[in-house]
């Protein structure tokens, strides 16, 4: 599959490529990752000024109205450069949820802030011991007059240390693993009773364990219908998978390019590595795996853009196949670079860490293979 992009979409891609080529090379990224904040507010402002943070949203909210296609374009280019700024967490996850499920007031208030780069968000859905089960929620939300009172814990919330606001899943009714009874709430990160324990992830980002004790939010902070959060998160997961697959495709492309360049210049036994036929075959296999991942990602993106039902099976199939392809390409790139492939001084090791992190977000390849098998 090969998507024919419109002139506007090509302009978006070219703009992102130029910005990242000029200002987000490997050395610049490394400085950002080891900084105290771990991300660049300067680059975030530039993303906002270029319209990247608004690109997926409808025009009425200052966006381009390009939806999943804009997300794919931006995420693929971000994957090429290992961008750490919270586009995925803020725009794809939170912004996507607010645009899809928010009230008119919530959309007007929050989407414009996201598009302008004025607010950072994170999605707190995973819980200790719950693995990838969206229904496995023990955090509670108790109605008290015009407010809800939230108590519980969330695990490995990516981007939470950077966020101003969180979208939190909590149970308003039912038992821990019931599909019904999960609700979503917009929570200010500075709320009384909410505590973060921050840590660095293997791919250079930031995450946090979150505990909440009697955190009070207004009733208007409910996002979507009460008790309908699990179904909402299922749709969010499919959109998230489309974005993550695009990022992985971008990273795989750079791994292939770096490996090919290395094979052309690194000499062994007096000749370039690339002259050995067995290594040529291996790099062809890497190229084929990447092209298969590109096709599946584009297919999923077009399905998401058309808003057709039944994306669950396709999303899980893509997550599985792209996950396997990314791991294969990453492992081969490391092997062909030798022991130095995993050193911090060489970029391929950083790509390998990122694609490993992508694989476990919203369910790893094994989880989605099982989900694919059990979905009609």
Protein language model features and the residues they cover:
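Helix-loop "lid/cap" segments that line or gate small-molecule binding pockets
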Residues: 93-102
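Flexible, small-/acidic-enriched active-site or ligand-binding loops
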Residues: 132, 136-138, 188-222
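Short Ser/Thr-interspersed hydrophobic loop/turn segments at strand-loop and sheet-helix junctions
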Residues: 51, 75-79, 170, 187-191, ...
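Short Gly/Pro-enriched turn/cap motifs at secondary-structure boundaries
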Residues: 87, 129-132, 156-159, 175-176, ...
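Alpha-helical interface subdomain recognition
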Residues: 1-85, 101-106, 113, 117-118, ...
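A short, Trp-centered hydrophobic/proline-enriched beta-strand micro-motif
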Residues: 117-128
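Cytochrome P450 C-terminal beta-domain/meander region
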Residues: 133-151
